Amino acid sequence: LKGRLETLKVHSKDVLMDETVDLDALALATAGLVGSDLANMINEAAINAVKKGRKYVNQADLFEAFELVAVGGKEKKDRVMSDKERKIVSYHEVGHAIVTALQTHSAPVQKITIVPRTMGALGYTLQTPEEEKFLQTKDELLAKITTYMAGRAAEVLVFSSATSGAANDIENATAIARAMVTQY
């Protein structure tokens, strides 16, 4: 956390930022990102501010840049889903969020969206940890698996079938389960 905060400070020293900017919160949310990702985030935030006609970067610019770097591309608002697909994606993402909220070992949900991204995601549920952790307990790992599978479960519960939208969730849940068996 301290290293990410220092990296963010180094890359933002020449960038004008307003009073809403909280680099501590950004450092906490960016666990797993490397220095070049953090530098890209600061640069993208500055570009966002300039595009919007502002001299100062604000927290919203930084969060938008975080999503671009960490989540997978820019919003692709011109990708038009059918009403049925939008409904499926909505239930899928809400499934993740509800299960996250009901578990005691999950990071809280910060954002849910069904706006497609340029990297392929039709929506996502963003969780941000409340504190930096270097180890995860079995209960925390099982909570992650449960959360990943909750989107698919919501699809089956509401629509009586699952879609290909859960493919990445299944990959992530499987990777955690495999690591639990073979590495921990």
Named regions from a protein language model:
Residues 36-184:
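Conserved P-loop NTPase/AAA+ ATPase motor core
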Residues 18, 33-36:
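Residue-level signal for short amphipathic helical patches enriched in basic/charged
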